[in-house]
Amino acid sequence: MTDNDDRIKLEASWKEALREEFDKPYMKQLGEFLRQEKAAGKAIFPPGPLIFNALNTTPLENVKVVIIGQDPYHGPGQAHGLCFSVQPGVPTPPSLQNIYKELNRDLNIPIPNNGYLQRWAEQGVLLLNTSLTVEQAKAGSHANAGWQPFTDRVIEVVNERCERLVFLLWGSHAQSKQKLIDPQRHLILKSAHPSPLSAYRGFLGNGHFSRTNKFLEQNGKTPIDWSLPDL
């Protein structure tokens, strides 16, 4: 997994911003780990071309909002590199169902029949998991594989290079990244995680989507159209 590896397609602005990371020992070790896992016959999600989908879909200069997830969905056909999102034709996972419930409550947005969040990413919502790969049926299996320093650097880059972003930190894992964000430059919104285990302890009712758009408009930015088409 080097900058010259033709299998790693990274959007130009991110490639420039993260160039040094790809030369660091941890990243080379991560690449070797993934190669060994695949060689051992393990199913790794998402597929290789989609590992950096969040960065490739939302160029650095387009970022307005950052949503921090944990690791990809670990079922076949679900993950495609955007946190909380699933590919078309896959049932909407429980956490995303609660995100839709809050969107409906907060902004009266209809609940779509799918969990495909590509349209958010194309508008500047960086849907970043802190681990970008996972082994099939083993949640969190790559949490210590080496992704954390890389995705921490992604958060640091958007913190440093972008102005007046909104960071949505849902749950303790996402909130552990708050230390990487300057609250004088950006709006940080925190609540419980949308998981069914915690959604009723402060996620539902948090008003984060309307508050995000109000902040963007106050800072001269086009608000996010959170509505999603049925597929």
UniProtKB/Swiss-Prot annotation:
EC number: 3.2.2.27
Lineage: superkingdom: Bacteria
Protein name in UniProt: Uracil-DNA glycosylase
The gene coding this protein: ung
Entry similarity comment: Belongs to the uracil-DNA glycosylase (UDG) superfamily. UNG family.
Function in brief: Excises uracil residues from the DNA which can arise as a result of misincorporation of dUMP residues by DNA polymerase or due to deamination of cytosine.
Keywords: Cytoplasm, DNA damage, DNA repair, Hydrolase
GO term, biological process aspect, one: base-excision repair, AP site formation via deaminated base removal
Organism in which the protein naturally occurs: Pseudomonas aeruginosa (strain UCBPP-PA14)
